[in-house]
């Protein structure tokens, strides 16, 4: 879990900004949003299948784009 120690002579805004950066880097907010509601395994598998298909199509597009330049 991210934590920030406030340095002497440091404003609240600067400390808050550092805290926000740490939470963004650790993906805390996105994980909390994902776990907010229960998802059955069928939904998780469906999302994984969709993302795998998107990833494959993107790679195929990039490969074809690269080959057309040769």
Swiss-Prot record:
Keyword Flavoprotein on entry: no
In the record, which residues are listed under signal peptide?
none
GO MF annotation list: structural constituent of ribosome
User: What GO terms in the biological process aspect are recorded for it?
Assistant: translation
Q: Which UniProt keywords apply?
A: Ribonucleoprotein, Ribosomal protein
The disulfide bonds in this chain are none
Coiled coil start-end:
none
Q: Which domain of life is it from?
A: Bacteria
One GO CC term, this protein = ribonucleoprotein complex
Q: Which family does it belong to?
A: Belongs to the bacterial ribosomal protein bS21 family.
Report the NCBIfam families cross-referenced here: S21p
What protein am I looking at?
A: Small ribosomal subunit protein bS21
Q: What is the lineage of its organism?
A: Bacteria, Pseudomonadati, Campylobacterota, Epsilonproteobacteria, Campylobacterales
| Designated gene of the protein | rpsU
């Amino acid at each position: 879990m991210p934590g920030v120690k406030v340095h002497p002579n440091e404003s609240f805004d600067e400390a808050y900004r550092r805290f926000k950066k740490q939470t963004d880097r650790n993906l805390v907010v996105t994980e909390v949003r994902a776990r907010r509601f229960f998802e059955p395994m069928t939904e998780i598998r469906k999302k994984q299948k969709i993302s795998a298909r998107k990833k494959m199509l993107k790679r195929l597009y990039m490969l074809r784009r690269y080959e057309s330049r040769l």
